[in-house]
């Protein structure tokens, strides 16, 4: 297979500095919004804020820039100087280093700086320690304010810096060009802007990090150049050290954080660097190996490298080095997406006051809390995958045989405090005697120190992490007991609390209290096997192949090689276009709302009697049948499309962008995206390590420097091979743009000069653009060449995908949602004796058990029952989707998919389906949920929380997260959401003899079950994604068109529903009351919908709750609730003096000549248990066609 030729796109970018220091008076308007979006700890004056046009940068801000990174000698005698430029883009975060106290802290949790310092020491990471000489030359925020004429007590100073050069600022390799300062306007206010340039400008041909930036006599400084004062601001440097370098050091397992900063800065300055960037004396975490493998601690006496974990340690550092290099390449990328503009946010539409706008932002951020919680509490989250394990050679007899899966990432959060060992496996001095926690089966509690490590030991990011966790619940919705914060705080005044961060008055907001409240969801690291990575990403395209049959009959498959057709013509004949036409026609009939697939359209006004139900169902069936017939006719007759093979190759697919401006406007969400990308880069690099090691003397001291370029090239060669798509750009300077830079001789206070010549050092760039995630539609068995282990895994899955033969309850069938919602209109007399309330559960249970008195049914009732039964049986006979429709949109799409499956002769196995768990927000459902935000603590905590709840609209941050599920993903993905999902990357060679490594990003699962998200269900036939929509909130909305299994309340209730029966509602209510107790009264209609996925039953639950409260005179009583439930059960259990009963079992099956779905040739219920009646080679009913002719739809 030949490599596709790379086509380079030329893009023009303006020259500029590597960053700016913005200095402004603290704004009177917008400060609350800025505080909500920022990350700040209450014990610090610094903060991290998002880069937002109109809030932190001016309108027209150029995100892409050719950074002036150094100078070169030119001319015959090397006397002239030209500038060297490198493309980059501005970081999506800005760093507030003076005046951060004017921003409200992200959380009231006390002493987060102390916690981070303690955690850093405990896990062995280095602290920020400026050199004594540097402190003499500090440029303070007060000094800058004085120079710019700002009041230091009312000023806000922050750094806006390019992505590739943040570390250069951190290690003092830059200076402020004071003479080049100018003024811009942000939100109507005047703001000073001081350019920041690298010191390398004064050292021609010096493309390295300057180890001693304050040495004005450095020998590389050009002759007659006036060397400037390096920019050193201690709060800023510490902030960058903690919030930028710290997370990378944790992800790459490098305890020497300063070395990571210097390595990243060096990669930015030296575009030709090839060897190792991380230091040679890097240390490693000792941990006990997974079962059946040798320990990873000290040397295994006399054994070779692999036996003592030497190759595992080597793979760990080399993969980290390669990931750092890959991140450096991405930092030099140029992106199309501009930074988000706050004036264009749709969530502000109609919000006229500052308070209303702040409330809208608070509500949106609470949505994202659900995704943050999933990343923290999922055991395979990228945040936890910080160590490398070794599965051993693929062939124990031949160690040189390469294996893509020998080295892999494993959760390391709980073993981070283990002893550190050196390259040879010897324990590092200072770590002797430390206990070694095992990878599996440890008893460590997830504590505040672990949470600090996930944030890179940054108090600001930790504060924002707590902001989100305070808006998560402890999975109350699935029946878990959540800690009573009021009682805990009150009791703690008389007992010892294992926390020295808080006092009695601040305990309610302490990080320890928040983690205690969420204790039931803490990650439990019970496996160290190679598995999927839980990643956080962003959909930045409204296009995705997430329909029920994915990319079946897609544009690329139908396109003719001669290019004789227009794109529009081809698109009209795709499966995707057919689904759009079906949905558009149903929307015209007012049955659905395409933008909200779970909505019922105007059905409440349409279905007012049984005849209307017949009409709606028949219309849906006719619309789908017509489109499917036309689609298959076009595919078979018009295009000779191999439609059966096409189904086997169909995938659900979507792409996650690497564009940093597509992420949510929050530093912590950007951190989650960065950590996810680093995990993916390392996974790719680890897959190539064994191939690099094979046949080499890995113990050699120079091995890393010699072979790091080889590994880096191998990783780069994996681009555009199925998973990580890359884009090649040719970068040129904007036409007519003058290269302005500080004078090299006049000093840093002199104005800029524009007489420089210069060129771009990195002209052609190939950089990753997006990650492609896919899931095969059909359950595929193991291939013939698969390993025995793979075949065994597939065999274990077959039972989960096997379609059972049992007959499904009518209410759990295709029309169940309509029958429950409109029962009163369809069967107004379908109510238990003695009751005035029509009850569908009682009616259909009695009917299907042949217990319903015939006298209760009119002729019209019987005709409707026959119609419903026939549709349900016919649908069940061809159904291979393991989900019942919940609305007309799902009914139409499922029915359409099943019809296509019937044409393709699909049988036996359910197909894979997708479910989006959509993050939402609401005001706190109880006083307990608001405890962390109370202005009063200690004895006044409950009163403070109640006061907040009484005036909740005055608190823009007082929102909590919630979830709702949706089984039609295309509209969800069209909202370009932030997502969290499992990702498993397979690697394989191409055709025989080809050494090109292809990959597939497989849609996998988050481990941790209900810990990750309360609505996650253990079902192998379903793939889940957590989604927080952006379109319609922080970006323009686009129009539609063109783990471990854990029993929970959620599953218990759905099990009750699936069993059916007349008393389903009362049984569900009783189970909930017994599980949740008094918390049942706090469940709102959204909670019931999330639990039950049934609108009718949700309304019943709200009514039963109201009756229980009424029975208890406004107070909740479990006895009163159970009494109400038993009364409801007794009511629907009465059948009275039945007399002759209606025989539902025999009714409707006597007409064997009735025409089932799909016309005369389609299999009806009579064929449900038999072999298909039509020939396997002909999808339309008759025998094989004449070999001389083409297959046509009319061959029946």
Swiss-Prot record:
Biased composition (Basic and acidic residues): 1174-1196
Top-level taxon in the UniProt lineage: Viruses
Zinc finger extent (unnamed): 499-512
Keyword terms of this UniProt record: DNA replication, DNA-binding, Host nucleus, Metal-binding, Zinc, Zinc-finger
Entry-linked InterPro entries: DBP_sf, Viral_ssDBP_head, Viral_ssDNA-bd
GO BP terms in the entry: bidirectional double-stranded viral DNA replication; DNA replication
Positions occupied by motif Required for filament formation: 843-844, 1142-1144
Keyword field contains Repressor: no
Annotated stretches, region: Required for nuclear localization: 1170-1196
Protein's cellular compartments: Host nucleus
Subunit structure: Homooligomers. Forms double-helical filaments necessary for the formation of replication compartments within the host nucleus. Interacts with the origin-binding protein. Interacts with the helicase primase complex; this interaction stimulates primer synthesis activity of the helicase-primase complex. Interacts with the DNA polymerase. Interacts with the alkaline exonuclease; this interaction increases its nuclease processivity. Interacts with ICP27; this interaction plays a role in the stimulation of late gene transcription.
Family, similarity comment: Belongs to the herpesviridae major DNA-binding protein family.
Stated name of the protein: Major DNA-binding protein
Natural source organism: Human herpesvirus 1 (strain 17) (HHV-1)
């Amino acid at each position: 297979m030949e490599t596709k030729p790379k086509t380079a796109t030329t893009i023009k970018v303006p020259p500029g500095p590597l960053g700016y220091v913005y200095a402004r008076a603290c704004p009177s308007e917008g400060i609350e919004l800025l505080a909500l979006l920022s990350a700040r700890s209450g014990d610090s004056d610094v903060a991290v804020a998002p880069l937002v046009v109109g809030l932190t940068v001016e309108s027209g801000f150029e995100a892409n820039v050719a950074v002036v990174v150094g100078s070169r000698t030119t001319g015959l005698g090397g006397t002239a100087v030209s500038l060297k430029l490198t493309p980059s883009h501005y970081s999506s975060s800005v760093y507030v280093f003076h005046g951060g106290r004017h921003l409200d802290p992200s959380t009231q949790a006390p002493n987060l700086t102390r916690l981070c310092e303690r955690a850093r020491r405990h896990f062995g990471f280095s602290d920020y320690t400026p050199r004594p000489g540097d402190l003499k030359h500090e440029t303070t925020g007060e000094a800058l304010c004085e120079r710019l004429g700002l009041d230091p007590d009312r000023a806000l100073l922050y750094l806006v810096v390019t992505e590739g050069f943040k570390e250069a600022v951190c290690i003092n390799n830059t200076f402020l060009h004071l003479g080049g300062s100018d003024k811009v306007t942000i939100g109507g206010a005047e703001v000073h802007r001081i350019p920041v340039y690298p010191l390398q400008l004064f050292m021609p041909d010096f493309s390295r990090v300057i180890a001693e930036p304050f040495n004005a006599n450095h020998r590389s400084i050009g002759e007659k150049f006036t060397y400037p004062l390096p920019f050193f601001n201690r709060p800023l440097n510490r902030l960058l050290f903690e919030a930028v370098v710290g997370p990378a050091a944790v992800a790459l397992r490098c305890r020497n954080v300063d070395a990571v900063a210097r390595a990243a800065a060096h990669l930015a300055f030296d575009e030709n660097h090839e060897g190792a960037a991380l230091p040679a004396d890097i240390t490693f975490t000792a941990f006990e190996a997974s079962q059946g493998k040798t320990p990873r601690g000290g040397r295994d006496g006399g054994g070779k490298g692999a036996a003592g974990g030497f190759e595992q340690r080597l793979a760990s550092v080399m993969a980290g080095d390669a990931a750092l290099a890959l991140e450096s390449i991405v930092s030099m990328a140029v992106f199309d997406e501009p930074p988000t503009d706050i004036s264009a946010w749709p969530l502000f539409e109609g919000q006229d006051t500052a308070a209303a706008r702040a409330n809208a932002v608070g509500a949106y951020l609470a949505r994202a809390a659900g995704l943050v919680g999933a990343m923290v509490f999922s055991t395979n989250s990228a945040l936890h995958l910080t160590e490398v394990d070794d599965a051993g050679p693929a062939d124990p007899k031949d160690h040189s045989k390469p294996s893509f899966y020998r080295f892999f990432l494993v959760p390391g959060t709980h073993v981070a405090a283990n002893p550190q060992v050196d390259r040879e496996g010897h324990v590092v001095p200072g770590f002797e005697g430390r206990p070694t926690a095992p990878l599996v089966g440890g008893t460590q509690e997830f504590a505040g120190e672990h949470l600090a490590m996930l944030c890179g030991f940054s108090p600001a990011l930790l504060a924002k992490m707590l902001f989100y966790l305070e808006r998560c619940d402890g999975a109350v919705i699935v029946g878990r007991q959540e800690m009573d914060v009021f009682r805990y705080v009150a009791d703690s005044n008389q007992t010892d609390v294992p926390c020295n961060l808080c006092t009695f008055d601040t305990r309610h907001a302490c990080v320890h209290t928040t983690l205690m409240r969420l204790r039931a969801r803490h990650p439990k690291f019970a496996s160290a096997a190679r598995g999927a990575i839980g990643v956080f990403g962003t959909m930045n395209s409204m296009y995705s192949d997430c329909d029920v049959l994915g990319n079946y009959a897609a544009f690329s498959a139908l396109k003719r090689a001669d290019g004789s057709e227009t794109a529009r013509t081809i698109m009209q004949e795709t499966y995707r276009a057919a689904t759009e036409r079906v949905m558009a026609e149903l929307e015209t009939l007012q049955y659905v709302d395409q933008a909200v697939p779970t909505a019922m359209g105007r059905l409440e006004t349409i279905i007012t009697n049984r005849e209307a139900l017949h009409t709606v169902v028949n219309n849906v069936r006719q619309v789908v049948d017509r489109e499917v017939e036309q689609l298959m006719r076009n595919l078979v007759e018009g295009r000779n499309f191999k439609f059966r093979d096409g189904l086997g190759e169909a995938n659900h697919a979507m792409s996650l962008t690497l564009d940093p401006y597509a992420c949510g406007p929050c530093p912590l969400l950007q951190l989650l995206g960065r950590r996810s990308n680093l995990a993916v880069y390392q996974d790719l690099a680890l897959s190539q390590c064994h191939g690099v090691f094979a046949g080499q003397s890995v113990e050699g001291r120079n091995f890393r420097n010699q072979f790091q370029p080889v590994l880096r090239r191998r990783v780069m060669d994996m681009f555009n091979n199925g998973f990580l798509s890359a884009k090649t750009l040719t970068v040129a300077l904007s036409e007519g743009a003058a290269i302005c830079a500080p004078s090299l001789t006049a000093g840093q206070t002199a104005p800029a000069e524009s007489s420089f010549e210069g060129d771009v050092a990195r002209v052609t760039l190939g950089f990753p653009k997006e990650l492609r995630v896919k899931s095969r539609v059909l359950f595929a068995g193991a291939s013939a060449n698969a390993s025995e282990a793979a075949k065994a895994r597939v065999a274990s899955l077959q039972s989960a995908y096997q379609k059972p033969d049992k007959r499904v309850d009518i209410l759990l069938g295709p029309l169940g949602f309509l029958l429950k919602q409109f029962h009163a209109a369809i069967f107004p007399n379908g109510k238990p004796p003695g009751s005035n309330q029509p009850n569908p559960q009682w009616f259909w249970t009695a009917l299907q058990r042949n217990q319903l008195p015939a006298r209760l049914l009119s002729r019209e009732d019987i005709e409707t029952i026959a119609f419903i039964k026939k549709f349900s049986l016919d649908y069940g006979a061809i159904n291979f989707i393991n989900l019942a429709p919940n609305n007309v949109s799902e009914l139409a799409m499922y029915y359409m998919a099943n019809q296509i499956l019937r044409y393709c002769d699909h049988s036996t196995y359910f197909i894979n389906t997708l479910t989006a768990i959509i993050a939402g927000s609401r005001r706190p459902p109880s006083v307990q949920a608001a405890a962390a935000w109370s202005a009063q603590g200690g004895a006044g905590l409950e009163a403070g929380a109640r006061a907040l709840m009484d005036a909740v609209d005055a608190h823009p941050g007082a929102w909590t997260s919630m979830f709702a599920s949706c089984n039609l993903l295309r509209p969800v993905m069209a909202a370009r959401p932030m997502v969290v999902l499992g990702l498993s990357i397979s690697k394989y060679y191409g055709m025989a003899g080809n050494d090109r490594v292809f990959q597939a990003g497989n849609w996998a699962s988050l481990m941790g079950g209900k810990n990750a998200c309360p609505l996650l269900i253990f079902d192998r036939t379903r793939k889940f994604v957590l989604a927080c929509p952006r379109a319609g909130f922080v970006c323009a909305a686009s129009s539609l068109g063109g783990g471990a299994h854990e029993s929970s309340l959620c599953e218990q209730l759905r099990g009750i529903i699936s069993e059916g029966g007349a008393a389903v509602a009362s049984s569900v209510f009783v189970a909930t009351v017994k599980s949740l107790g008094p918390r049942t009264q706090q469940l709102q209609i959204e909670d019931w919908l999330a639990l039950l996925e049934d609108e009718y039953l949700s309304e019943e639950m709200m009514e039963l709750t109201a009756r229980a409260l009424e029975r208890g005179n406004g107070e909740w009583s479990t006895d009163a609730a159970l009494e109400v439930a038993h009364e409801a059960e007794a009511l629907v259990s009465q059948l009275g003096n039945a007399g002759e009963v209606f025989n539902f079992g025999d009714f409707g099956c006597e007409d064997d000549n009735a025409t089932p779905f799909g016309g005369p040739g389609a299999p009806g219920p009579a064929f449900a248990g038999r072999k298909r009646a039509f020939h396997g080679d002909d999808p339309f009913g008759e025998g094989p066609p004449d070999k001389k002719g083409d297959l046509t739809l009319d061959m029946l």
